[in-house]
Amino acid sequence: MGLQRFSFFVTLALVARSLAAIGPVASLVVANAPVSPDGFLRDAIVVNGVVPSPLITGKKGDRFQLNVDDTLTNHSMLKSTSIHWHGFFQAGTNWADGPAFVNQCPIASGHSFLYDFHVPDQAGTFWYHSHLSTQYCDGLRGPFVVYDPKDPHASRYDVDNESTVITLTDWYHTAARLGPRFPLGADATLINGLGRSASTPTAALAVINVQHGKRYRFRLVSISCDPNYTFSIDGHNLTVIEVDGINSQPLLVDSIQIFAAQRYSFVLNANQTVGNYWVRANPNFGTVGFAGGINSAILRYQGAPVAEPTTTQTTSVIPLIETNLHPLARMPVPGSPTPGGVDKALNLAFNFNGTNFFINNATFTPPTVPVLLQILSGAQTAQDLLPAGSVYPLPAHSTIEITLPATALAPGAPHPFHLHGHAFAVVRSAGSTTYNYNDPIFRDVVSTGTPAAGDNVTIRFQTDNPGPWFLHCHIDFHLDAGFAIVFAEDVADVKAANPVPKAWSDLCPIYDGLSEANQ
């Protein structure tokens, strides 16, 4: 009883503190602490004391100065860390992108590092997470919102603030490095940091409060390590207006399948009868369904009783389909309107050997020297750059097309693929055999679909951002098993375009001096 009461008060404290946003200048203290977001107490990684990590906010044009102070002590979740600011282009600050051994050496425990980057031309919904091994699964993951004072969608909603951010988290009772290499499902789904597991049927659920007659811009963020979720709110349609930081033409849906690391803004009109309505986030595998309030939260109208909903789910009739998404403002597709009509086309063949994933016959093994440091030290060609077979130089100012055919040889589909440093045009989506060179959505994480559907997802982007940029499956357990490559973009200009601070240059000597137990 004592532990349960303690866990209840810990949960209350976490909820109370997790709503306070920080930024654009902030200190992030990364530490180990016991948490119980689903009523089960476990050691985890907290940022400024909370799980999920606190909301970071700013506005378009801001300079973000985010000082990461590593005080980690538990080697089973790693003592070092490195943070990726997901969705930001990091033009001129490739060193601040975050992936360990691609863009930097990890920050050692007992040290801090300042991520200092500008966001001149991006606004929308982003997130941040550890980019070292599977560390973000243990708690280092949180939402990041950049507001646009001139938001073209502003007339469509009345409320857009800290209370309208919705995070979806797969939560595990065992630390990622101590559990199975490929877990068969999470113990709980957390919505805004709260949820229930099979062993904690009375744990608190998140409550999202609305007032009748108001329109809310909700920012749905998948901070998942693995599953995708089908998200819906009983009795309400959702109007999607933003996709991964890209404004989109308004699209009315009644459910959203959201893959790991994707984000959507949707407008909800609180025009239904005052009451309580189930918010649902059903994972694609593991403990599915909603029995006893699992995979759920509560939408509560002002004036409704403090009670769990009694609403029932209806069959989705207008689910979100990616090919129905289009940018709000015209965004020309790089290249010419034919398959392969680009300066450089690459096909990525996926494989798996029971332990590791492969792309074009290479599994990504983190190099001891970060790719950016290799380039700054003079490495220029694929032959020079490590890991061998996993680094693809891309020419400057060129159009690039990547095909990612789904295959039964790479189990665990659909695999959501994320490209760092860019948003890309999705010219062929999962579930579709047609190519759209006119007005496809641009985004930074795309589902590569399933072999059963014969999917051959195809994306395009322009090389306008010198630096090494990771492309990888965002199922963190798959990334840790090598499901990644690096694009070394415009290698000749990387050094001039990305001046590195001295503190960055100090990271590797410090990290390389650590014993394995202190890494």
Swiss-Prot record:
EC numbers, comma separated: 1.10.3.2
List of residues binding Cu cation 1: 84, 418
Catalytic activity: 4 hydroquinone + O2 = 4 benzosemiquinone + 2 H2O
Keywords associated with the record: Copper, Disulfide bond, Glycoprotein, Lignin degradation, Metal-binding, Oxidoreductase, Repeat, Secreted, Signal
Disulfide bonds: 105-508, 137-225
Cofactor(s) required for function per UniProt: Cu cation
Protein name per UniProt: Laccase-2
